């Protein structure tokens, strides 16, 4: 990501990425339906719930807005605190 940000900076373009974790989507619906697996998995998350599409969308909207114009080359974990629990 940092290399992309360096290359794009000369064009006044910022580059960042979002590192997501388990998120409620149609593709994860059957996996999330297993209560025992969910309980074990969510015990590793500070927030204790899977992500929702809006959780990721809100970060993407921020990074696409003028509010983030001075941010580049960063990775943002949007994962319910999973990386804090490691």
What are these regions (language model features)?
Residues 9, 14, 71-73:
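Short, small/polar-rich loop/turn modules that mediate ligand/substrate recognition or access, typified
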Residues 10, 22-45, 86:
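A glycine/serine/threonine-rich, flexible loop-to-helix segment
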Residues 21, 48-49, 74:
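Glycine- and other small-residue-rich loops at beta-strand/loop junctions that grip anionic moieties
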Residues 45-56, 67:
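A conserved structural motif in NAD(P)-dependent oxidoreductases
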Residues 61, 72-86:
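Short C-terminal tail/terminal secondary-structure segment
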Residues 1-10, 20, 61-65:
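Alpha-helical segments that scaffold the active site and NAD(P)H-binding pocket
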Residues 14-24, 64-67, 77-79:
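Conserved SDR Rossmann-fold cofactor-binding beta-strand/turn motif
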């Amino acid at each position: 990501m940092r290399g992309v940000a360096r290359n794009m900076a000369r064009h006044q373009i910022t580059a960042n990425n979002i590192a997501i974790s388990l998120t409620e989507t149609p593709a994860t619906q059957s996996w999330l339906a297993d209560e025992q697996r969910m309980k074990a998995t969510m015990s590793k998350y500070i927030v204790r719930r899977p992500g929702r599409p809006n959780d990721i969308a809100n970060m993407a909207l921020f990074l696409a807005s003028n509010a983030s114009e001075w941010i580049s080359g960063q990775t943002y974990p949007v994962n319910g605190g999973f990386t804090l629990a490691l």
